[in-house]
Amino acid sequence: MAETKYIFVTGGVVSSLGKGIISSSIGKLLQARGYNITIQKFDPYINIDPGTLNPYEHGECYVTVDGMETDLDLGHYERFTGIQTTKANSLTTGRIYKAVIDKERHGDYLGKTIQVVPHITDEIKRNVKLLGKKYHYDFVITEIGGTIGDIESAPFMEAIRQLKWELGKNAINVHLTYVPYLRAAGELKTKPTQHSVKELQSVGIQPGVLILRTEKHLEQDILKKVASFCNVDLDCVIQSEDLPSIYEVPVNMQKQGLDTAILRKMGEPIGETPTLGPWREFLDRRNKATETVNIALVGKYDLQDAYKSIRESLSHAGTYNDHKVNIKFVNSEHLTDDNVAEKLAGQDGVVICPGFGQRGIEGKIVAAHYTRTHDIPTFGICLGMQMIVIEFARNVLGYADANSREMDEKTPHNVIDIMEEQKNITNMGGTMRLGAYECVLKQGSRVFNIYKKEHIQERHRHRYEFNNDFQKEFEKAGMMCVGRNPESDLVEIVEIPGLKWYIGTQFHPEYQSTVLHPHPLFVDFVKTAIENKKK
């Protein structure tokens, strides 16, 4: 393709309709046709990034390979397409305004009055086109967070309007709306969609494709009505019914011709429809799995999206082990020595989840003690790894006051300590150890046999690390340090070889698990949990 084409995905009526899944599905379908694609997310909030946002409000913070803290939708982009994202794939209003203000302070605008139009909108447009220009992508898919009509989205909508005018057929808007079903009347209502499209048209944007989220199947007469009232071609009105799995969405979208509609509207040749072979094989294997394995997630956040990547990674691993993974959430705040046996009863494996702060950590330590002493397969991730280290120090090494400097600055047995380069940092946002770092695995260790190689790269998001001063004591007592960063000499992985599966990673392996390439640690963990269930 001579020129990069741009697809803008917007949403209307209500939030949380699944724009991220639709964007990922479009990317997957175009990728299957041989196009070079990327997906980016523009969030209208004023935070610089989601790194300091409450997981209860916004779900997990996803980390890119180059260390950008981003929205969880970037996790969907990577899991669907297998393409790694970077800082350029995530943008917020905060970053846009900061860039413009920094330029103004530098004198780049030569004394002009800085306004939303053109300066903010120009900066948005520059960032939209940045990836296409730099990497010569065939398609850049840009998801706009929020809902049409939100006051904070206005500059993004104006930027899209301008880009559609400037780029002509090389730009298209895909608008996702909701068609509610009124149970009392027994009717599906299209009026909210009509109003949403009118709102979009009022800012100068005509959607090229409409996707209707619905709980009930939409008959042809409803689709014709929407097409007529919204000035959209009938073959460009697509319905997105609720499905058992988000991974069925690309197949459903292909069946209705979403990719062909986009290509036709943008003047691209249609060609043969891809078979989506490996993707369909994954779905077939997933649907044929009848047996289940029970995995408990021990953490302090009740919102499911707070552990989105872990849940999806377990799901991938279950499929490749021909099992469905039944996930039980166990709130670590309410976990005690008295109730841990009851709370973890019937669980074939336990993940001790990441997090920050004091709240809920003693419950995680209780869980780590129970799973270690009862030989239940256990996977500690980030803070979870730190908790299994603290539990071991308290109950095996005999340091009853062992702790992390994060929780107790005065503990004499600081088995988890703050990294040297973090000691003088006061800002919270974007200052942790972030992104991919190299790790060298100890030959003969369980993790070495799982990865089947010595050198790996995994993504991090933390300030605290295993304290090397205690390494000899830990290893003498049976907890081995089996993964280490060669540059900083930081311990990245610990394991207890004498147990079925007791591994802690300071990094977040869940960020690198995709549909077609599940993460080896999760695959082996679930495999061991299945074996544990059978025994």
Regions found by a protein language model. Give the residues of each.
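Active-site proximal loops enriched in glycine and acidic residues that flank catalytic Cys/His/Asp
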Residues: G11, K41, T214, E241, ...
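Short beta-alpha connecting loops at secondary-structure transitions
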Residues: E57-V65, L243-Y247, I352, T373-F379, ...
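Cysteine-nucleophile active-site neighborhood
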Residues: L17-G20, S24-K28, A32, K343-E438, ...
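A generic structural signal for well-ordered coil/turn residues at beta-strand boundaries
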Residues: E3, Q206, D233, E291, ...
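Flexible phosphate-sensing "switch/lid" loops adjacent to ATP/NTP-binding sites
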Residues: M1-V325, E333-G349, F356-G357, G363-Y370, ...
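Glycine-rich, charge-decorated loop segments at or immediately adjacent to ligand/cofactor-binding or catalytic sites
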Residues: L182-K189, Q386-N395, I496
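C-terminal and late-domain segments of enzyme folds
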Residues: L434-E438, K442-K535
